[in-house]
């Protein structure tokens, strides 16, 4: 006989709701019976925040067409009982199902989400069968050029602002070789006069400001009101690729990936190293760090995100105090760690390098990133 879950006291439901930390646990609780939904509000992190904005596809011409700015939550998926011995993980976003074949689930006990994994048609998976870990979020532009095949993410940052006693927002966008800005009070795109001579590479918002990296290595801070730009470079500049990774609103990390042997005859990507810094906002400078604690930095596809290793699935192969690039050439990568012994006398120890404990195969990158982890014993051939 099925228990009548609707008879649970409201006081007990309120107590349960206060102890659910995972957004998918909340969704599962809401699926038990309809009367529970008032006690378990739908998680805000799964609600797709979106804004209709003027399209910029024909900039500087003004268009009456609209595009959509969406805030997408990024998750890491792993089957609790994988069929294969080699674990696979999927990194990607979850959005609302707006397809024509959208259907109501046949049972309130079925807590499912529609997923598109590599080399498969979209299908429903029961969330209870997966470990699902939130890794942050990103903003994407959709439908900005209906005639273009590349109508997805182009590089955008969103910043809510308080002005004239009301809630407004500012959007900074990387489009081709331009930086465009839109204020909600005006709803039109304007070109930003850049201080750097190079093209924009990446941009994030953090604590009320925009931070922008350029291809020549410049890093600038943009004030959202005046668009005044301030150079914010490390005290010891490196010829490197620079990546900005916010840790919520608590910290902003800078990862610089560089070749420690630029004069070598052969370019060896496996010997590239990283330097990691954290923003000291009060001092207005980058402070080098050698210990990320339990944090893991994911850099590459689906933006750059930071999470606690304690939230990652057991045996995932990525431990704390590490960096994982998901956009490495050749679809093979390793986590970067500090102080790795390579056995080569010329390799500096006090630096972030490949740790070959776990090899990460990047099986697919769209529509989600598929990662396959292999133990060191399985890839000794790479060290020869």
UniProtKB/Swiss-Prot annotation:
Kelch repeats lie at residues 87-137, 259-309. It comes from the Eukaryota. It holds the Pfam family F-box. Residues 3-51 form the F-box domain. Transmembrane segments: none annotated. InterPro entries: F-box-like_dom_sf, F-box_dom, KIB1-4_b-propeller, SCF_F-box_domain. Coiled coil: none annotated. Keywords: Kelch repeat, Repeat. GO terms for cellular component: cytoplasm. PANTHER family: F-BOX PROTEIN SKIP23 (PTHR47123), LOW PROTEIN: F-BOX_KELCH-REPEAT PROTEIN (PTHR47123:SF24). This is F-box/kelch-repeat protein At1g64840.
């Amino acid at each position: 006989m099925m228990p009548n879950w609707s008879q649970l006291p409201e006081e007990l439901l309120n107590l349960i709701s206060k102890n659910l930390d995972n957004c998918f646990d909340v969704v599962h609780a809401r699926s038990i019976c309809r009367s529970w939904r008032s006690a378990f509000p739908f998680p805000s992190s799964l609600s797709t925040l979106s804004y209709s904005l003027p399209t910029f596809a024909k900039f500087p011409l003004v268009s009456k067409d609209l595009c959509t700015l969406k805030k997408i939550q990024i998750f890491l998926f792993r089957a609790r009982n994988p069929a294969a011995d080699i674990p696979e993980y999927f990194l990607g976003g979850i959005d609302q199902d707006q397809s024509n074949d959208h259907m109501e689930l046949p049972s309130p006990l079925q807590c499912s989400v529609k997923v598109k994994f590599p080399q498969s048609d979209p299908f429903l998976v029961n969330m209870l069968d997966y470990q699902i870990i939130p890794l942050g979020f990103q903003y994407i532009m959709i439908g900005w050029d209906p005639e273009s095949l590349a109508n997805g993410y182009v590089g955008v940052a969103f910043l809510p602002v308080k002005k004239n006693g009301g809630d407004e927002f500012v959007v900074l966008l990387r489009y081709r070789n331009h930086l465009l800005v839109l204020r909600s009070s005006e709803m039109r795109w304007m070109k930003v006069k850049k201080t750097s001579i190079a093209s924009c590479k990446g941009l994030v918002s953090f604590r009320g400001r925009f931070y922008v990296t350029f291809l020549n290595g410049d890093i600038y801070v943009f004030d959202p009101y005046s668009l005044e730009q301030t150079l914010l470079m490390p005290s010891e500049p490196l010829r490197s690729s620079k990546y900005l990774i916010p840790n919520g609103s608590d910290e902003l990390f800078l990862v610089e990936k560089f070749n420690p042997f630029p004069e070598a005859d052969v370019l060896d990507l496996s010997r590239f190293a990283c330097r990691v810094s954290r923003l000291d906002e009060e001092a207005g400078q980058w402070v080098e760090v050698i210990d990320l604690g339990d944090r893991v930095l994911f850099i590459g596809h689906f933006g750059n995100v930071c999470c606690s290793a304690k939230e990652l699935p057991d045996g995932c192969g990525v431990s704390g105090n590490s960096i994982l690039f998901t956009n490495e050439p050749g679809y093979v990568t390793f986590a970067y760690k500090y102080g790795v012994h390579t056995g080569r006398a010329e390799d500096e120890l006090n630096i972030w390098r490949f740790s070959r404990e776990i090899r990460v195969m990047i099986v697919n990158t769209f529509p989600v990133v598929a990662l396959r982890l292999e133990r060191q014993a399985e890839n000794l051939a790479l060290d020869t």
